[in-house]
Amino acid sequence: MSDNSKENLRQIKSYVQRAGRVTKKQQQALDDYASKYMIEYDQNKSLDFSEIFKNSNDVVLEIGFGMGGSLVQMALENPTKNYLGIEVHKAGVGNILYEIEHQNISNLLVMSHDAVEILENMISDNSLSGMQIYFPDPWHKKKHNKRRLVNQSNVDLFAKKLKVGGVFHYASDWLPYAEEVLELLENDNKYKNLYDGFAPRPEWRPLTKFEKRGQNLDHPISDILFEKI
């Protein structure tokens, strides 16, 4: 892929910023807790994870945590890992801020900005022990495929930010998208598949709302786990 093609892909957003309904509880959480648990986007500042988490534990980045239920569960079940979640929709951000505060979660922080810009400008190379993208928008119409978050340009970007040995975990209920991601990663010499093809569903990955919806529609659930080499 040419540099110009990669740049064009970067400029196409993988999401649509909808107004959406924000409940009173979510708005209250945004007002009360954003200063405690949210990191503002600053294109001129690289994050120092040991400073913001106040420890040197491994950091896992999740892009698009939705309402945040599965990410909250993972943070609670893995207290020796730090989690940074990115979500652009206010309702989900408000929801997760409420949970962080009321469940006293100390290893989870949140950002609300374009994930690619955060990765490019605020995440140091070779700094993440894991990246996870669960049930991203499949943009299933062919004319919208270019909006998909996991594309060749971003796969290269993810590899830059992962440590050697860091794991990229993708899950989807839209098989054509999952097959496309699997092919991208299989053909990239910066990654090694931890399984032969698709991975079995990990017991430690919490069930998400979108996964349940996919199951109700009889969509196959695909997990992909690749290690940076």
Swiss-Prot record:
UniProt pathway: tRNA modification; N(7)-methylguanine-tRNA biosynthesis
Enzyme type, top EC level: transferase
Enzyme Commission identifier(s): 2.1.1.33
Domain of life according to the entry: Bacteria
Any Pfam family matching the protein: Methyltransf_4
Any one Gene Ontology molecular-function term assigned to this protein's record: tRNA (guanine(46)-N7)-methyltransferase activity
Name of the molecule in the record: tRNA (guanine-N(7)-)-methyltransferase
